[in-house]
């Protein structure tokens, strides 16, 4: 599997066993001026959604986390 990896949003091959791509958006203390922080990467399971996330996308095709 290949996924986009933050901070550069470049496509990289995921480690063995990490077949899920994800994109998380969440607010930090600068959210009102800079917008949400975006994290992209690979995972073995979809990260658990928490109340601090604005959005969470998990997908299973190459580079689907754009």
From Swiss-Prot:
A single GO cellular-component term on record: extracellular region
| The entry's keywords | Acetylcholine receptor inhibiting toxin, Disulfide bond, Ion channel impairing toxin, Neurotoxin, Postsynaptic neurotoxin, Secreted, Toxin
Task performed by this protein: Postsynaptic neurotoxin that binds and inhibits neuronal nicotinic acetylcholine receptors (nAChR) with high affinity (IC(50)<100 nM). Is a selective, and slowly reversible antagonist of alpha-3/CHRNA3-containing and some alpha-4/CHRNA4-containing AChRs.
* Main subcellular localisation: secreted
Q: Does the keyword Secreted apply?
A: yes
The record's note on quaternary structure and interaction partners says:
Homo- and heterodimer; non-covalently linked.
The protein in question is named Kappa-flavitoxin
User: Which tissues is it found in, per the record?
Assistant: Expressed by the venom gland.
Subcellular location per UniProt equals: Secreted
User: Where exactly are the transmembrane stretches of this chain?
Assistant: none
- Name its species: Bungarus flaviceps flaviceps
The family note in this entry says: Belongs to the three-finger toxin family. Long-chain subfamily. Kappa-neurotoxin sub-subfamily.
Amino-acid biosynthesis found in the keyword field = no
Disulphides: 3-21, 14-42, 27-31, 46-58, 59-64
Under Gene Ontology molecular function, one entry of this record is: acetylcholine receptor inhibitor activity
Xref: Pfam families? Toxin_cobra-type
């Amino acid at each position: 599997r290949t996924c986009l990896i933050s901070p550069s949003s470049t496509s990289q091959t995921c480690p063995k066993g990490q077949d899920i791509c994800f994109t998380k958006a969440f607010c930090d203390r600068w959210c009102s001026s800079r917008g949400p922080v975006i994290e992209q990467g690979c995972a073995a399971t979809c990260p658990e959604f928490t109340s601090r996330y604005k959005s969470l996308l998990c997908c299973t095709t190459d580079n689907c986390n754009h």
